[in-house]
A protein has these predicted regions:
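Rossmann-like dinucleotide-binding cores of NAD(P)H-dependent redox enzymes
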Residues: 104-107, 111-142, 193, 221-267
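Ferredoxin-type iron-sulfur electron-transfer modules and their immediate structural context
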Residues: 1-81, 129, 168-186, 200, ...
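Conserved acidic residues
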Residues: 164-165, 206
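A conserved short coil-to-beta-strand element within the FAD-binding core of flavoproteins
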Residues: 148-161, 264-274
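General small-molecule cofactor/ligand-binding pocket signal
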Residues: 106, 145-147, 186, 260-262, ...
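Flanking helices and flexible, charged tails adjoining ferredoxin-like Fe-S electron-transfer domains
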Residues: 51-53, 57-82, 100, 104, ...
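Rossmann-like dinucleotide/flavin-binding elements
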Residues: 83-108, 147-159, 173-176, 190-248
Length: 283
C-alpha cells in the first residue's frame, strides 16, 4: 500500500497500477465497492482521517489501465491444466494468479458474462459494467481463457477433458434466514438479481419495507426506490441509525435517495398488508 501511494503521489500511475496488481487482481472492483474496513484501524484516524486507499487504488486503475494492459504477458506454460468453475471475483482472481505462475487456466461461467455477484446482483449505481469488464481484461491478459454460457455438471466432466486441477468458485448463494415469523418476504439477493436483470419486473406496489441495517439492506432500499410505481421505501432496523452496520457513505446515499428510516423496531410479521413490529430500547 505505501508503495503505490508513493507512486501515485509522484505521478507514476502505471507503476502504481503494476504494484497493485502484484497482490490484487481486481483493482476496479476493489477500488469501487471494497468495504474498506481497514480504514477504521488506520492510524491517521488519530490525527485527521483515514488514508483513502480505495479511492487512490481506483484512480491508479483508471489512469494506468490503457498503458499497463498491453504490457501484461502470459507466463511460460507449466504442466498444470486448471479449470476454474465460476467467473466471479474469487474465480477471476484465482485464474489471474495461477496463469501468472504458468498454469494453463480456463474459467467456466454459466452466465453470458464474467463478474459474478458484482455483475448480476450489486446494483449498477454501485458499480458499472465498464469497471467489471476492465477487471476481466486484466485477469485474462496473463493467458487465462474465459468460457461463458457453460454450466459444469460435475468435476468428472472436466477431468475427462484433461484438466489436472479444478477450483470450485461458485459463491455462497444460500438464502439468508427469514426475517419474519409470518407473512411473505423477498430474499435480498434474489430481489437484487431480478431487478438488475429486468428493472420493473417485480410489482412492489407503492410502499416498500426493507428489514436490516447493513450495506445489502441499503442496496435493496435504493434499488426499490427507483422501481416503477414505488413511492415510499422505509428501512426498518432493530437498533438506531447510529448503530447500523452499514458504511456511513451507504447510509448517506440512501438518505439522499429518499429512503426513510424507522429505528428501534423488531419486525414480527405481515398481516393484511401491515408490518407488525415490537418496539425496542437500546440497552
Amino acid at each position: 500500500i505505501p508503495a503505490y501511494l508513493e507512486a501515485m503521489e509522484e505521478g507514476r500511475v502505471e507503476d502504481a497500477l503494476k504494484i497493485i496488481l502484484e497482490k490484487n487482481a481486481l483493482p476496479f472492483t476493489t477500488g469501487t465497492i471494497c468495504p474498506h474496513t481497514c480504514a477504521d484501524r488506520c492510524m491517521r484516524n488519530h490525527y485527521e482521517s483515514a488514508l483513502r486507499i480505495r479511492e487512490v487504488k481506483l484512480m491508479a486503475a483508471e489512469a494506468g489501465f490503457e498503458k499497463v494492459l498491453p504490457e501484461l504477458k502470459a507466463a511460460a506454460a507449466a504442466d498444470k491444466k486448471v479449470a476454474v468453475i465460476g467467473g466471479g471475483p474469487a474465480g477471476l482472481a484465482a485464474a489471474s494468479f495461477l496463469s501468472r505462475a504458468g498454469a494453463d487456466v480456463t474459467v467456466f461461467e454459466k452466465n453470458d458474462k464474467m463478474g459474478g455477484v458484482p455483475r448480476y446482483v450489486i446494483p449498477g449505481f454501485r458499480i458499472g459494467d465498464d469497471a467489471l469488464d476492465k477487471d476481466v481484461a486484466l485477469c485474462s491478459a496473463y493467458g487465462a481463457k474465459m468460457v461463458t454460457g457453460r454450466e459444469i455438471a460435475s468435476v468428472q466432466e472436466l477431468k475427462d477433458e484433461g484438466f489436472t486441477d479444478i477450483i470450485v468458485a461458485i459463491g455462497a448463494w444460500a438464502h439468508g434466514r427469514k426475517a419474519l415469523k409470518y407473512g411473505d418476504e423477498y430474499d435480498a439477493l434474489e430481489f437484487l438479481e431480478k431487478v438488475k436483470a429486468a428493472p420493473g419486473s417485480i410489482d412492489l406496489g407503492t410502499d416498500v419495507v426493507v428489514i436490516g441495517g447493513g450495506n445489502t439492506a441499503m442496496d435493496v432500499a435504493r434499488a426499490a426506490k427507483i422501481q416503477p410505481g414505488v413511492e415510499h421505501v422505509r428501512l426498518v432496523y432493530r437498533r438506531d441509525r447510529r448503530n447500523m452496520p452499514a458504511d456511513e457513505e451507504e447510509l448517506v446515499m440512501a438518505i439522499e435517495d429518499g429512503v426513510e428510516f424507522m429505528e428501534l423496531l423488531a419486525p414480527e410479521g405481515v398481516e393484511n398488508g401491515v408490518l407488525k413490529c415490537e418496539k425496542n430500547v437500546l440497552g
